[in-house]
Amino acid sequence: MAAASNGSEYFEFDVETGRESFARPSNAETVEQDEEDLRWAAIGRLPSQRQGTHNAILRRSQTQTQTSGYADGNVVQTIDVKKLDRADREMLVRQALATSDQDNFKLLSAIKERLDRVGMEVPKIEVRFENLNIEADVQAGTRALPTLVNVSRDFFERCLSSLRIIKPRKHKLNILKDISGIIKPGRMTLLLGPPGSGKSTLLLALAGKLDKSLKKTGNITYNGENLNKFHVKRTSAYISQTDNHIAELTVRETLDFAARCQGASEGFAGYMKDLTRLEKERGIRPSSEIDAFMKAASVKGEKHSVSTDYVLKVLGLDVCSDTMVGNDMMRGVSGGQRKRVTTGEMTVGPRKTLFMDEISTGLDSSTTFQIVKCIRNFVHLMDATVLMALLQPAPETFDLFDDLILLSEGYMVYQGPREDVIAFFESLGFRLPPRKGVADFLQEVTSKKDQAQYWADPSKPYQFIPVSDIAAAFRNSKYGHAADSKLAAPFDKKSADPSALCRTKFAISGWENLKVCFVRELLLIKRHKFLYTFRTCQVGFVGLVTATVFLKTRLHPTSEQFGNEYLSCLFFGLVHMMFNGFSELPLMISRLPVFYKQRDNSFHPAWSWSIASWLLRVPYSVLEAVVWSGVVYFTVGLAPSAGRFFRYMLLLFSVHQMALGLFRMMASLARDMVIANTFGSAAILIVFLLGGFVIPKADIKPWWVWGFWVSPLSYGQRAIAVNEFTATRWMTPSAISDTTIGLNLLKLRSFPTNDYWYWIGIAVLIGYAILFNNVVTLALAYLNPLRKARAVVLDDPNEETALVADANQVISEKKGMILPFKPLTMTFHNVNYYVDMPKEMRSQGVPETRLQLLSNVSGVFSPGVLTALVGSSGAGKTTLMDVLAGRKTGGYTEGDIRISGHPKEQQTFARISGYVEQNDIHSPQVTVEESLWFSASLRLPKEITKEQKKEFVEQVMRLVELDTLRYALVGLPGTTGLSTEQRKRLTIAVELVANPSIIFMDEPTSGLDARAAAIVMRTVRNTVDTGRTVVCTIHQPSIDIFEAFDELLLMKRGGQVIYGGKLGTHSQVLVDYFQGINGVPPISSGYNPATWMLEVTTPALEEKYNMEFADLYKKSDQFREVEANIKQLSVPPEGSEPISFTSRYSQNQLSQFLLCLWKQNLVYWRSPEYNLVRLVFTTIAAFILGTVFWDIGSKRTSSQDLITVMGALYSACLFLGVSNASSVQPIVSIERTVFYREKAAGMYAPIPYAAAQGLVEIPYILTQTILYGVITYFTIGFERTFSKFVLYLVFMFLTFTYFTFYGMMAVGLTPNQHLAAVISSAFYSLWNLLSGFLVQKPLIPVWWIWFYYICPVAWTLQGVILSQLGDVESMINEPLFHGTVKEFIEYYFGYKPNMIGVSAAVLVGFCALFFSAFALSVKYLNFQRR
């Protein structure tokens, strides 16, 4: 026996010994039994205390002996389940599942059988809801649009209504209306209903996660107990529709974290001891594979869990377990895989009550079937309680459920066994047509537009039956009575297992929680390595600049003037450390959505995350302080003593910690990028102004002195000054006073002179860091995310008329789509597409440099023919569409693509084609009608009149049934505005209004319920019938959707085609082709051909029958027919010309600019969180500056007064400017994703778009300038002459403009907002240092003076100071200077009197430069990776 490195032990049995010990006849069953005996013999040899944590597994060798069935040299190995490596965990799961398919039936059956043999029962939960009503208060009509005026009105109305002065004017919206029901353990319940029926609200209410603003009445119980009696958030899980994950973690890391936090081991750990004890007592020997799995799954506190491997396998995520999850801007797993990660994250734990909200979005029907089947096995065998809402369940998926709840318009229309639902509707007079899925029928039968087609009672004429009547009929039917009688019987609490409901808030201890969060944060810091390295290099770089500006050869401790320069250097170090923390803000806010989701599911307490991230910032602060001190301290020549050097370093560390705490606090309180940026700037403004450097304490107004004592920077400033100026080298007697230079300087600037102020400074700064981080923890614990989803009730005058759809309208719609267009054929032959081999795969030893995603794909798309592109997830459907449409931004494409026989030209192709993307990307602040009008105006030819365009937009809106939503705001996905399916229809409509000849649609029906999918497909079919060429990728086609297609291109993983050609009536051509292949099981009657086709072409089946579907297709008649077709259509018809246009875009540049400006104007007017907040902040900042520097402009008797005025202007420029630059970045960033879609669609050129984006800012900047200018000009007390006031406003306007354009430029030049924030902050530091305030122009060394001239803040200061004080002849009489104010300005600041015009011209130049850089970045840079 030898001990292995991972805590495993080997027992080598040679085969002969094995045969003697267990002599039996040789067949497969006895071999298995022999192996089992060997395993138990190995376990039996272990000491008894180790038998609970060890298990025996059989390591199978490659060769299997024919005679005995034993492996040559097979090794039975005992492993310690607490020390499993990844290979062991994967092997355990594989052996326990006992199948290569994605199925858990054998494993769960074996576990159930094991428990049944000793008479143990698993805890069960029954969920009941009785008389549940849920109401929301909503704004109606145009008041629901968030314009600047409406938001201001809402704010004042809220204030007045909270003071009981007025009554709130809102409309009540009933989301759920008096519904009752039971969800039983051990039975799978499906929740169906059209969009807006209240499915998500019901799921959230049952999971105890209902938004506090909704009014709930009625009762919800688990096992007869109310929700406040136990921890409902740990007992049940709500699996959300939106996929919120940390993009930089891999799938496995995401699930491992979830498993540890939820205590994945609790599931089995609770009864493993009792189970093994009972088995020993009764002499029962379980299967060793199941025993090994259960033991491993019940191990607590391990970093990696066997539950993760199990969930990865069951959800089919094992293929992408080491891929980053990714997000919209970062490449990661596919949309369908991300949706499964969301499911896996909640199911990896021990929760057995699951409320699953549309978990199949983006999955093909066979994957959905597999997953639902695995969940059904879990429900039936482990007595779990599951309520699952699905949008378009295929018939075979629908049949997996036991019970059904049908909601519509908030009413409960049916609840009971699934098989009785058709009988109930037949009793009302409706009938299910043949070849129609039950789920599709149920979603449409309650709808006003679709109900009539299902009427089947010849005895009476059809009359619309409203939902309320159907709900009443259900309550009075035998099915309703049956449901009521179940509810009437009270739950038997005695039979309930007390351990079924969780009584503690978290699954693991506080220490464990902290460890888990710490490990994850450390991993994320490694993933954000570039950001942190960049920030450290930036500190080094700015430090180097500072060191060379204040070089010690130029500075000597011989006079107060040099002392002032040293003080500027010290102050700048502090301010830089402070600003360096600002980039923590976007990082923190981007992490909040995931944090809130995990907090609300009781993964971990808020403090464990906030402390872990705080602790990991400590080494980072140490590094920053060491780098800065190392570069700056001795180069500048600060007090040469080791003690003072280390004290300097400690002080910088404390300031950095305080700053990180401050910005994290801002982020956790604001919870929104724009608001946080704005109020973050306001906080720094106060801290900075009252820090004791810009204004000495003696000059601070009495009403602001408290601010000086509260400002953390003032303590840092005093400590750093005391540390330097009490050193021995500053003890030379002063020439202008009777003390030493050092003490005189401290007194002049109102600093204390005692050494203990250094230690007070350190203590206060660290105290602030602790305080701020505690506030972060409290904010994370008690505040909820902003921007909750709100239903918006819109007043639509046409609502009633729109619902009456008559035959004439349908006919006119079909005609209405015919604006003139040219039918086109697209052929493509042997298309290949490669990308560079991903690093992860190269690191695993893959030798190739390129990865092939498409392999010799050929086909034809013809006019009037609807083609489906089908394949499992990852088959390359979207890739093929992107390549054909010319949407790929990277990779290598080969092959021949032709349009009506002519080679494809991308620029003209964008004009004649439309591309409906899978992600519905739209500007959030415009309405549905405005989105369509914008697209139509830009993309329809100039020749079409405005009236024709309007009529066309109307017809398209009716066609996709968006006419009742014309005034609805688009909003952000998953939070505000349109629902998923409404957004999808809008995406299609935006392309249809362009009147294209060829339309590509990527997943037009994913994320839609059956009725919405039918509406979309009806739209698509109508479009094709007008003679257009339409191609759709499709995931989950129901029979009717699939059979709406004419032709099919079927792909498999690796981007290979396995079928191309006609579908035939009832898909007969396709079925005949596959049934003609030897080994393919035939299709059963009434089964969905799309589902069957995906099931019979899986890799598992290819392996089983040893065949390659791609090769078989290449040898088939179908393939030869397609090739012949391509050959014939690749030659242009005689006399035909390739498509060409006189210009690249359908509108000229001026029209593009005006339309972009029109849209941007709407976006800005409806962005109160940006524009209203900016104006409010400007007003607050102006009042702060005005009251801090009250009347300082009229004092001109001393140099200190003039320096203070300069300080006021410098602070205002820097802070308001930086605030403008920071808060514009998220707006530009959101609009950029929309721009990428619109640019790819050929809507407009980049320059008109950029011009509109820049120009729309001007009126808001002007308003901001007037607000700021009027307040500060008169409070600071400058001369009240009109010309000086106008000049002041002009300089401020130009300053705010160049800062805003600089912020836009920073986003334009970088791939994401985080990097834009970090890079722009580097320049703020340099502008701060060399703007002429900290180091005046005459004192800037010759090697840096060039930077002074390219620093825009320097020109602002020069312009403003000269415009206000450049002509003042008042005298200054001081020991160091004697002359007029005008002369002092030239002597001290280096400003020449005739430079006002030049300064203004230079600032206009900076505005133009930054704007041009933004425009060029928009034109030439593309950070979208496709």
From Swiss-Prot:
InterPro entries linked to this entry: AAA+_ATPase, ABC2_TM, ABC_trans_N, ABC_transporter-like_ATP-bd, ABCG_dom, ABCG_PDR_1, ABCG_PDR_2, P-loop_NTPase
Major site of localization recorded for this protein: membrane
Transmembrane segments: 530-550, 569-589, 618-638, 649-669, 675-695, 760-780, 1172-1192, 1202-1222, 1258-1278, 1285-1305, 1315-1335, 1342-1362, 1396-1416
Protein name: ABC transporter G family member 31
GO biological process: abscisic acid transport; abscisic acid-activated signaling pathway; export from cell; glycoside transport; intercellular transport; negative regulation of post-embryonic development; pollen wall assembly; transmembrane transport
Subcellular location: Cell membrane
Family designation: Belongs to the ABC transporter superfamily. ABCG family. PDR (TC 3.A.1.205) subfamily.
SS bond partners: none
SUPFAM superfamilies, A to Z: P-loop containing nucleoside triphosphate hydrolases
Name of the coding gene: ABCG31
Residue positions where Phosphothreonine is found in the record: 276
Induction / repression: Induced by cycloheximide (CHX).
Membrane disposition: Multi-pass membrane protein
CDD domains xrefs: ABCG_PDR_domain1 (cd03233), ABCG_PDR_domain2 (cd03232)
Organ and tissue specificity: Expressed in seedlings, stems, leaves, siliques and inflorescence. In seeds, confined to the endosperm. Highly expressed in the tapetum of anthers.
UniProt cross-references to SMART domains, sorted A to Z: AAA
GO terms for cellular component: plasma membrane; plasmodesma; pollen coat
One GO MF term attached to the UniProt entry: ATP binding
Binding positions (ATP 1): 193-200
Ranges for domain ABC transporter: 160-434, 826-1078
Job description of the protein: Together with ABCG25, export abscisic acid (ABA) from the endosperm to deliver it to the embryo via ABCG30 and ABCG40-mediated import to suppress radicle extension and subsequent embryonic growth. Together with ABCG9, involved in pollen coat deposition of steryl glycosides required for pollen fitness. May be a general defense protein.
Ranges of residues in domain ABC transmembrane type-2: 512-725, 1151-1365
Catalytic activity: abscisate(in) + ATP + H2O = abscisate(out) + ADP + phosphate + H(+)
PANTHER family: ATP-BINDING CASSETTE TRANSPORTER
Summary of the knockout phenotype: Early seeds germination on imbibition without stratification, and reduced abscisic acid (ABA)-mediated inhibition of stratified seeds germination. Pollen grains of the double mutant abcg9 abcg31 shrivel up and collapse upon exposure to dry air, and exhibit an immature coat containing reduced levels of steryl glycosides, thus leading to a low viability.
